[in-house]
Every structure is written in C-alpha cells, then in structure tokens.
C-alpha cells in the first residue's frame, strides 16, 4: 500500500513552489473525477509497470487479471487513493504546508525502508499521469498543475529514498 501512497507523491504542492489556489483547484477537481476508480487506477499502474506490482508481496508474480477483482486488491487500492486524496485536499493552502510536508516525508521514509527507488516513483508518476490524461478533461493548464504538484512531491520524497 505504502508504495502507492507514493501516488500521493503526485499531488502535493506545498514546497519550493507551492501550488496557487487555481492550480490546486485544477488538481483537486481532476482528481475528484477519478478518485472513485481506485481499482482501475492501481490496475493501470501495475499494467504499465509490473515491477511496481512486484513490490507488493501479496501481488508479486501474480497475473493482474486474477487479482484485480479481489478484496485484497480493492482494499489496497483504496488505501493508496485515500492517501492521495488527503494530500490533494490539503494542497493549495499555505497553512497546510507543514501537514503536507509531514505526510510526504513519511511516505519517502516508509518507501526507503521497502527498497523503492526514485525511478519507481517516476514510473508511478508516468502511469498516474497517463491514467489522468485518459480519464479527465486534460489541457495544458491541468497538465501544468499536476506537473508542478508532482515536482513538489518529488522534491520531498526523492532525497529521503
């Protein structure tokens, strides 16, 4: 689960260049449009990057089609999306910067302990953005807001790995 909490990494916006209220609104509204698709989001990441799936002992080496409809998969996907939702909800408000930093720092620390690399965080980012592009109204403004949020997240996570 915590690896995909990495996903959270995709949504911060409280660091070097915090998200503006407008940027946060774009990230939040686009996330709201897909956040109920927990299983599909995680399945898209695993399909694009099987090495990420193999980081989860309960899913490692298994056919994605055989695990996608299981309770364990749905539970894990919900944990990841819920973490991301929390970070996204906090973004765009300067008074929440410390909370976002704490959450994302812990994410980095937890994933370091699991041997997750910066490259795998990058893979997760790529898969998440591809999922968003295919499932939400995606223009240059939305892309820029997500890129800024993800860049901010990586600025916290990567040094901790």
Swiss-Prot record:
Q: Which UniProt keywords apply?
A: Heme, Iron, Metal-binding, Oxygen transport, Signal, Transport
GO cellular component, as recorded: extracellular region; hemoglobin complex
| The keyword Metal-binding is annotated on this UniProt entry | yes
One annotated GO molecular function: oxygen carrier activity
Misc. comment: There are at least 12 different components in Midge globin.
- Please give the subunit comment from the record: Homodimer.
The molecule here is called: Globin CTT-VIIB-10
- Gene designation per UniProt: CTT-7B10
